[in-house]
């Protein structure tokens, strides 16, 4: 049974980038509501500078150094570290939700309040899956601090997962193999909705090329757009009563479906497609991704067909009044 009085947990995933991590830590300490959270730091490998930044900057309840055997790809190490952090947040701290920050995600002073407000507002909705903190919508495009959208999408770049969602993705995160963690959890996220602000509550300073998968001109441009969208200091304080759901596009990727910009039929199709993707992922997990069974059952072909539906849904506009 969930302990409703337990504090939410912030999991900080760190590696060798102590300078970036310092900026993340400083932004967290300055964020409104920081004292209401437990903090768990996870350092991937022997990086004493990063360990020191976490210990002295955040004074975490738990600080763990993880050693991985063999030569794992960075995405596999990140996935395993994430699994450790989420498991401790929900099983050890009994948190109602867990916030995950990598060592290049700098937060605004409203980030923690925004996550708390969204959780309070949506936690009882059975379709609520998670909260993201990012956006690249500029104030010049009419984005207000109060506004948010519901997306049929996944999570990343400063996000929070409620306990109920973790129960559904826990086994998927434990899968062995060469997987991106966000790809493992995305099918379940698409069975409902995630919340994104129109004004960003985070920036990704890893778009300078120091990250494992960043540094291209496209990434750098995205970083600039996130910075232009970022909420300023003391510009806004989110509560469960002053946030406003808006029906509009959310420019990001072709497979991001802005649910409230669709009619009722479009939303049902998006949810239904997500359910099928999630069931397919669960089936492949149960079969341990066996090439023989995957081929015999045509699972890869079915998955490709389902994935083709998503950009078409994302391109739709409201058809019904």
Segment roles from a protein language model:
Residues 2-100, 105-321:
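Peripheral/terminal regions associated with large enzymatic or DNA-binding modules
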